[in-house]
Amino acid sequence: MVHFVGAGSGAKDLITVRGMNLLKNADVIIYAGSLVNPELLEYAEDSCEIYNSAYMTLEEIIDVIKTADSENKDIVRLHTGDSSIYGAIREQIEQLNSYDISWDICPGVSSFLAAAAAAGCEYLSLIHI
């Protein structure tokens, strides 16, 4: 099973509780090292295999996932923000579907929501400013 986890808007403590628990229980984590706060990897167990996808092709990422899935390992694909808004997961999901690999999405705190919180107002208030 592959869990697409949204890492939140940058701070280690802005990941969702579900996302943190998925990281804690992961056997394999593939993260976007050029974008994701590396402090989030501190939630992983020492035995977890960690891959920085910043230096990997889509084919290499899918190969890691296929191998881990064939060994019944729990896999986290860690993306920035909320991966269901913008996380470049479509092409990965298409590949996973073609190999009958199960997946789900754990949303993260989006940057536009974090911006509203930092501004001390509601998101809809920002639209009217």
Predicted regions and their residues:
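Glycine-rich, flexible N-terminal cofactor/catalytic loop recognition
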Residues: 1-55
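Generic beta-sheet signal
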Residues: 1-5, 71-79, 83
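Glycine-rich, highly charged phosphate/nucleotide-binding loops
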Residues: 54-66
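Glycine-rich phosphate/diphosphate-binding loops that line cofactor/substrate pockets in enzymes
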Residues: 22, 64-73
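Short gly/pro/ser/thr-enriched loop/turn and capping motifs at secondary-structure boundaries
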Residues: 37-38, 58-59, 110-114
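Class I SAM-dependent methyltransferase SAM-binding "motif I" and its flanking Rossmann-like core
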Residues: 11, 82-127
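General beta-strand structural signal in soluble alpha/beta enzymes
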Residues: 30-33, 52, 76-80, 103-108, ...
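Conserved strand-to-helix beginnings and helix N-cap segments that scaffold or border functional pockets
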Residues: 16-17, 62, 86-90
